[in-house]
Structures are given as structure tokens and as C-alpha cells.
Amino acid sequence: MARKKASKRYDSKGIVLKTGEYQRKDGMYLYKYKDTIGKQRILYSSTLAELRAKKEQTEQDLRDGIKTAKENTLTVNDMFDRYIITKTELKDSTRNNYKYMYEHYIREQFGQKKLASVKYSDVKAFYTSLIKDKGFKPNSMEVIHTILHPTFTLAVRDDYIRKNPTNGVMAEIKKSHNWEKTKRHALTEAQQTAFINFVANSDIYSHWLPLFTTFLGTGCRVGEIIGLRWKDCDFDNNIISINHNLIYRQQEDGKCGFHITTPKTESGKRTIPMLAEVKKALLLERKNQVKNGTFFNNMVVDGYKGFVFLNRFGCIYKPMTINSAIVRIYKTYNEQETKQAEKEKREPILIPHFSAHNLRHTFCTRFCENETNIKIIQEIMGHSDISTTMNIYAEATEKKKQESFKNLEGKIKIC
């Protein structure tokens, strides 16, 4: 017996409906299908064309193994929570920073979005709102992107979405806001000398001299300087060992405190020859601590003790305390130098705004001006990427080249 041919079904506009397609009495279109685990799912749309576009995408997802069953309920928050748990290689400080930024700026709004619904334009709009409404600067935006991009990458790898909607967003944001990576500039030799001399001869700021001398004589990071212990300083062989960082960060309970971390890369572990001026500064610091009683301080951080640089209360300096002191010092200096220059009818040697990290950059610049072996510079600085060293070297040698040609004026006969 011949099989009865199925009758055609039409929508309210007379268009033939395909298998699985339906139109309700209220005009809404729907498409019924089974997901990868055999459970019936339904797509809805107000137009047939839109329904068929959704249907085509869903069928493609099913062919490619995209998890259409869960994608309707999984949120950005769900994916981030999975990402941060699986990212076991993150340092505690980095992990806590990511969590802090996510909880404060992403979870409540953007994080509530359904994972599969997030488009490129959604990410761009979110980034733009952080810049305009929250006043985010390039560095903060980089952190947000560093959190979201791998979160969506994990979603792609787990077959929840087809492509990463954060791809290319930061490049467009930087272009539209004319952002360029902030360059850290070194102090000139004149500015460096003026700064150190002012500190050394000041009744108010002279206690900072050993710390700043060590910064400018080693090129260490601020976490390496404040974490330096007496046992890391070999005065017999004139060697300083850098093997850990001391960081001050917010913990999961919301409180802030000091913690020890190991360098992120092997290049961070290194030994630095102790310059005579640095040795003198460190011995002066020890003498001052013995005098005021802080040398025998028992402050312990994660099992580490015997820290070199302590304030008058015997406590470790916080990075923000050092940077605040730098600002106070150069502002006081600039004020006095401006008045003195007016009296002497000369141009003042003013010190620009800078932070503790600029002292590291200043040391590296002086080093580059006097050393041609890039590999040695990289090892002393603890740069994991030699391109970082090369960029500073190029900037330093370019300035030296300009100075050399200025000195040639009138000394070379051309015609």
C-alpha cells in the first residue's frame, strides 16, 4: 500500500512551514528539535526568517558538537568561576587581584549575561562603560581583558560557544581612545644627582637615603627591595641575592597584609653585585637600626624575617608609603630649587613626577649607557623577555648618540 504523503503546512502569510517549524495563534514562530542528549528543545522568534536563521545556527552547532543544551543557562559568571578554579598556575597575588577586579566590576552586571548571548559589541560597550563611567585607565582595562579573554577562550574550548567575543576588542578600544602604552622614563643624570643630594642633605628626608641609594644601585623592583633581608646581603663577597618578593595586597577576607611570593619566572631569581655606594648605604641602615632598636625587630612574614628596610616603628615599608615619600621629596625640592634658580638667574633643574619603579628604570638606563653586553643587563635586571631590555637599551643609547653629536659641534671640520 502506498505511503500517504504528508500534507503541507502553511503560516498565516501562506509560506510553507518545514519539518519542526510551527506558528502559534498569536503569530509567534517556533522550531522543535532534539539536543545532543535527546532532550526536546524549542527555538522562538517573531518572524520566520529569524527563526530559520536560529535554526540553521543551532543545526550547525549540533553538527560541530557545540553544547546547545547548556548554553541557554550558563552565564559569564559560571564560566569565570570555572576558569579561576582550573587556572592552578596563577600566583596567589595574581589570583586575588583577578578575583577582586571581577567581584567589583564584572560579576553584578556583565557577569550575569548568558554566555552564548554575548557578542563583540556587548564586550566593547562594557569596556567603554568602564572607561567613561568608572574612569578606567589603560592598565586597569588590560587587567579586565586579561580576565575575560581567557574565560571566553575556555568556553570555546569546552564547546559552549563557537568563537571568543572578546577577540580584537582591546585593539579597537586603544585605537578609539588614542591609547598608547605608558612609557616609564628614567631620571636624567642631573635629576638623579639632584634628588639624591637633596635627600642626603635634608634633616627631614635623610633617613630615606639608604633605601633610595639601594634602588638606584641595584635596579630592584619595589617588592624585592622591601623584601630584602640581611641574610640576602653578602658583605664579604659583595653580592645581593634576589630570591623572593614581598607584596602588600588585599586578601580574600577583604583585609590587606604583606605576603611573600617567589619570582614569576626563573630570571627573577638572580644575584646582583653590590656597588660600594650600596654597601655603604646598607651598612648605614644597619647602624641606624641598631641605634634606634629596630634592628632586632622580630617581624615575620610567611616565615621570612630580618628585613633590611624598616620604618621608625620597626615595620616594613608599604609600596604606597615609598611612592608618597618620593612625591613629597621632589615637590619640596622643586619648590626650593625654583626659588634658588631665580636668585642665581639660571634655569632650575626640576625633577618630574616619578615613582619607585622609575628608579629601577633609571638604574637600567645608567647601566645601558655604560654596558654593551645586553645579556648581562637582562640578567641583572631580571627581565624574562630580552625585548624589554632591548627597548630600554635603544632609548638610552639614542640619547647618548644625540649627546655625542652635540659634543662634536665645532670639533669636526666639514668644509
Where do the protein language model's features map onto the residues?
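C-terminal secondary-structure termini that scaffold catalytic or DNA-interacting sites
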Residues: 1, 237, 248-269, 276-278, ...
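Basic/aromatic DNA-contact patch characteristic of tyrosine site-specific recombinases
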Residues: 1-74, 78-81, 85, 100, ...
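N-terminal core-binding DNA-recognition domain of tyrosine site-specific recombinases/integrases
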Residues: 35, 42-43, 47, 72, ...
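C-terminal catalytic core of Y-nucleophile DNA break-rejoin enzymes
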Residues: 43, 47, 239-241, 250-251, ...
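Basic, Lys/Arg- and aromatic-enriched nucleic-acid-binding interface segment
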Residues: 138, 142-146, 157, 161-163, ...
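Short, basic (Lys/Arg/His-rich) helix/loop patches that form interaction surfaces
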Residues: 197-208, 218, 272, 288-298, ...
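Short, polar N-cap/turn motifs at the start of nucleic acid-interacting alpha helices
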Residues: 232-239, 372-392
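Catalytic-site neighborhood detector that most strongly recognizes the C-terminal catalytic loop/helix
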Residues: 246-248, 362, 381-407
